């Protein structure tokens, strides 16, 4: 079909006031020949078709009206002095989280989160086990989903970083738990968000790129490399960047 999007009905969901699209340099070198920006509204197919815009107004993830107001002001770049004062009221420099409530400390930089996690792990009087990722092909270090060398102990607080795609749906990206048993082959995690202990298996991540066939003008996905590791990371602390999109 010569119709936009092949004549297929398309539903697009997103928020333009979130982070801009992430486009690799080599991909943009190709795409910039055809598009003015990496945003979807620069799509030529979109400009050739009629579309209806629907704005969702009901918020379900938050119920606190004051907090919602602060979030919306930040999102719209309208935060003022009163907004800052409201946030500062929540600042409690002497707060010590209860050990059994699994608080997560958000940090601005990876090294800060790493230092906190290493210190908390060292405080556990138990044997440490190390698991090394299996990396094949091209998989840049900045794209590693978790540590290449993952050191864990029984009693460590961990976060799952991938959804369980099996029928059981035992864990999801952002779920917090504690390692209850561990050996050189693997470990078991207990979480209040699942009804039984979870025997964790290694997962596979793919590093893909999209390649344009100049002759057919078709775009195909090409897997350049894979990363195989247990889908967890230490979770006493995590960077703000990595916390985006997670539920915990």
Model-inferred region functions:
Residues 1-248:
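Conserved ATP-binding/catalytic motifs of P-loop helicase motor domains
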């Amino acid at each position: 079909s010569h119709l936009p999007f092949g004549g297929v009905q398309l539903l697009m969901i997103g928020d333009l006031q979130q982070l801009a699209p992430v486009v690799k340099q080599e991909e943009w070198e190709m795409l910039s020949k055809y598009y003015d920006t990496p945003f979807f509204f620069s799509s030529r197919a979109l400009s050739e078709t009629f579309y209806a815009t629907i704005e969702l107004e009901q918020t379900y993830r938050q119920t606190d009206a004051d907090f919602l107001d602060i979030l919306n002001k930040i999102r719209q770049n309208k935060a003022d002095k009163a907004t800052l004062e409201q946030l500062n009221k929540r600042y409690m420099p002497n707060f010590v989280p209860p050990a059994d409530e699994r608080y997560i400390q958000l940090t601005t930089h990876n090294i800060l989160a790493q230092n906190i996690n290493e210190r908390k792990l060292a405080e556990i009087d138990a044997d440490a086990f190390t698991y090394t990722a299996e990396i094949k092909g091209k998989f840049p270090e900045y794209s590693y989903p978790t540590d290449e060398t993952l050191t864990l102990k029984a009693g460590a607080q961990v976060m799952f970083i991938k959804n369980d795609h099996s029928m059981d749906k035992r864990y999801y990206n952002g779920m917090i738990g504690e390692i209850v048993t561990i050996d050189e082959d693997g470990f078991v995690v207990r979480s209040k968000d699942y009804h039984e202990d979870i025997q964790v298996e290694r997962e596979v991540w793919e590093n893909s790129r999209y390649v344009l066939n100049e002759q057919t003008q078709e775009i195909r996905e090409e897997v350049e490399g894979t990363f195989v590791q247990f889908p967890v990371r230490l979770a006493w602390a995590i960077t703000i960047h990595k916390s985006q999109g997670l539920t915990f």
